[in-house]
Amino acid sequence: LSKTAKFSNGKWKIENLNKLLLYCSNFEIANIGKCKFELYNYQKTAVKELLDIDEGSLIVASCGAGKTLIAIDLYLELLSRFKIKGPGLIVVKSSLKVQWYHEVLKFSDLTPSIIETTAKAKKKFDSQFTGDLLICNYETLNDDLVRERLLNMNIDYVFADEVQYVKNYAAKRSKSLYKFNKIKYTFGATATPIQKNPRDIFGIYRFIKKDIFTNINTFDKRYVKKNNLGFIIGSRNERELTDKIRDNLIIRTKDEVSSHLPKLIVTQKYCNLGPKIQKISDQLLEEIKELKSMQEAMMDRFNTIEEARLNKEFTDLDNQILMKQAFAQEITITDELLSYSDSVAAKQYVTGEKSEKIELFLDLVESIISEGDKVCVFSKFRSLQDILIAHLQKRFKNIEIAQVHGGLSSEQRYNEVQKFSSQKTCNILLSSGAGNEGINLSTAKYMIEMEPADSYLVQTQRHGRIERASSIHDTAFVYQLIANNSY
């Protein structure tokens, strides 16, 4: 009660009934839950809250909170209450279409259908518009024939997953989605909170509830802070902006769903670089430092960094710095990555020395799979998967390995995840950044990060693959592999 009400004159005054229901899991929420699977209390209260709002809304929920289940049940609830009549539209990232298709089948008796562009669909163009929940990616809506066909179907329900993809109001995919903003029930879901640029709110709500903000010029004058050069540096009137969207926003924080998530234990595992690789690492860091000094000396010739970036000599130095930074990152794992590189410059830094981090990785995998547990392995370097597979096959006989990367189709990725999740003999899944979002690895007890994530957001997305409400484990473990004295 203390979280949702105030005590005054001997009585509790409830300020937010939905929050009270959220924290009181023993309260029965009647007539909510039309899916095959029982919804958690925080999911039921989310659906109830959205039904009470009774128009477009933004759903912010942590990774693993089960936004897919909320979307499907919300559609069923609106259908059962005769608020909507026909099919609904689910808009997702391209890599998640197949995942959504199978989850609709898993969680309901609805018929899903994936919509492709005119060129891809060809002869089956008409048949793909039959179904209860139509699924397409954002870019598919750029296809004039697809978009017009959907608009003419008088769809009453649109749910945009990873809705931060339309935060740039001027992008083509954003404008295509905005064509559907006259529909009453337009929902967007994200695990990524709005961060620095207040215009993100304008872009997202242009789809969810177009009348909240009249136009971008008025929005900028009231809520956007710019410097003398016209660059956005922050926001203004934040409280007023929050109040504007409050009635069309529901949030489920990690604390609110944590009782349904496994406890996540993150541990750093350190190793040293071999002497030859350490020497190369030091050399690269020194070369990067020297290039940056050259850039700083050049800045006296320019008034702004933007002006400097128009200078070829300056941008050449920029490119060299980025290239050497990439090399410095790669050798913290193994200089075999440099051997795989198309860059001729990379080859001069190859030592052929055994990687201490690869050895640490193999030892961790051995201890994990010897207990019969599953582990997912993340790295932003796609070519590392081939290297790790070679080492794993050398260490372990008849080992089965699943892979997720950008070179696979949505169907192939889904099949790889299913193989890892359902087959007892497949205990290892290797993933590039393509697996940071949208895949459910609830059977994995362990995660290994071969290098630190580039940002806290990427790290949160990675961890969200195993920190899920559907996890079969009470505790999940993340090992972050870090090389001492390296980039």
Over which residues does each language-model region extend?
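Inter-lobe coupling linker of SF2 helicases/translocases
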Residues: 135-140, 147-154, 172-183, 212-346, ...
